[in-house]
């Protein structure tokens, strides 16, 4: 069984301009529509921030972007750390659903997406990164494009414990 993880695509995450945000949202929507038709679970991950930072539970900025397609039978997992597996119910849910393969997309490439990829790797999940389905912002020492390209390259070239990570564009999956 497979599942799609949509990480931190929250209103507050996009108060900072993100690289090709509209295109990323469009790609995630296309992929989620395709996977729902195949009865593949869609799991939205939401970061719970603190009053000292942002993404505080229950606030407008904590909500999933309204432009993302959500269905009532989609799953939602809250997290407090970058890695979706750290002190959350995700692993229990994935085991209950019989999931062994993850499609991973979302925000931010260099933080929560990357941390979750590594969390999934050490748990021996088969992983497909949605190459055009994750985004980030410019950082002090690298542009968003550089960070996205760098992480896509690293993920494609990692030597994980079982199977290699696939890095594919949306159209390669939905064709």
Language-model-derived ranges and their functions:
Residues 17-48:
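A short alpha/beta connector and helix-capping loop motif
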Residues 3, 30-33, 55-175:
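Active-site-adjacent betaalpha module
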Residues 47-51, 61:
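Glycine-rich, small/polar surface segments that engage phosphate groups of diverse ligands
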Residues 13-16, 50-53, 137-139:
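A short acidic, helix-capping loop that chelates divalent metal ions and anchors anionic groups
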Residues 4-14:
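Metal-dependent nucleic-acid phosphoesterase active-site entry motif
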Residues 10, 48-49, 108, 134:
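Catalytic metal-binding/acid-base residues of hydrolase active sites
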